[in-house]
Amino acid sequence: MNRFLRMTAVVLAAAFAFLLTGCGGSSASTSFTWFVDNIPANLDPQVATKAEDVIACENLYGGLVRRNASGELVPDLCERWEISSDGLTYTFYLKSGLTYTGTKGAATDYAITAEDFVYAFRRVFDPQTASPYAVEFSAIQNSAAVLDGTADPGTLGVSAIGELTLVFRLSERDDTFLSKLTLPGAMPCDEAFFESTRGTYGLSSTSTLSSGSFYIYNWTASGLFLHRSAASPLVNNLRLVQNTSNTDKSAAQLIADEK
């Protein structure tokens, strides 16, 4: 992932932090339409890099940490974290009882556990994934050897202790590591669900699970329509529609497309 792309992701995340926390207060502000160059096509967070895909992933997936409206890193799916004195070990304690959300807000039996993050990072460093996020997390122990196929994925410096404790071991200090955990590539991935999609993970509404504030309500040729998991005075309905084909559509037409 190059510097430009990384900055794009940061800017998009900041923009949405402002949008989703700064627009509340009235029912008129509970829906937002974002016109993008292309309708999102790939919502696999370990490979998503196009701007419209990153925008969607930033809202569909919750990770270990997130940035609040002030730009500070705060816990998201974890209760807290600890960093060793030498800066080489990061330990996260996940919240209990969390589950993924399916299409149209359907409840699922897929629990969010530490193993989901382990699997996500093994995917990042799987040569077959060709994840652009591998370079961002190159400080993780044995990441280079796993990526080039000379080491077993089980030796990667990401491990689970029980269901709710996740440990990262770095080969060198990286003071930006926490910040990088907000990138799409660091979002959790349930291995059983991933395998069940048979190569279509993140390519359709039925092959995508949400761990974040929004879930997929509909995904059509007209756009990607997201609804917030829990109603709030903030933006509750987010529409990502193509700029070139939808700029002349009325609000009523967009709502009709959403359904």
Residue ranges and their predicted role:
Residues 35-85, 209-210:
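N-terminal lobe/hinge region of extracytoplasmic solute-binding protein
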